[in-house]
Amino acid sequence: MKVRVQFFSRLRDLAGTSEMDLEVPERKTAADLLEMVYAKTPALREWDKSILIASSLDFVERTYVLKPGDEISLMPPVQGG
């Protein structure tokens, strides 16, 4: 199934793109998707512990089971004040 991954902020800079489409086997999780992303863009792996994941407008856990046509957003932690 096709899943679109969108990168924000520093992760977009490291990935060298704002988004990528990946073909993902059914019943895979957000954690599985991250491994696929890291295989294509190894520089993102160093951010693994702090990456926030969202599906559409909702933050999701790494155990989230992907659905066909999902748009997954990857972003670094939000900072500011």
For the regions a language model picked out, list residue spans one by one:
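Ubiquitin-like/PB1-type beta-grasp interaction modules and other compact soluble beta-rich domains
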Residues: M1-G80
